[in-house]
Amino acid sequence: MVKQEPDKYSWDDFVADGATDWTGVRNFQARNNLKAMVKGDKVLFYHSNVGKEVVGIAQVSKVAFPDPTDEKWFAVELEPVKPLKKAVTLVDIKANLALAEIKLVRQSQLSVMPLTKDQFDEILSMSK
């Protein structure tokens, strides 16, 4: 899962761009999560601060490479796959016991986080 403030770069901005380099990550754990991504991985796109909801599915289109804004860090290229039929709010995620261990709840400041297949699938099922 990747998090972004929608007033800075929203799902709609992402879709309009067609793809984007996910740059500017300056946390070691989040950086390591970027480096672990492989081409084709599905990634949930979360609006943070405003909305606080999962809004779409993206895909890794280019694996980790030096972040052009600071080459000590890493970025990946993501492309949009599709919006969720219904956004899944943070309130709904917190209320779902199957998601009790999700990093979004446990480490809310982390901007790039892994999900298990079960967590990913559970969020998708909540979006229908």
Features from the language model and the residues they span:
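Hydrophobic beta-strand signal
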Residues: 44-45, 59
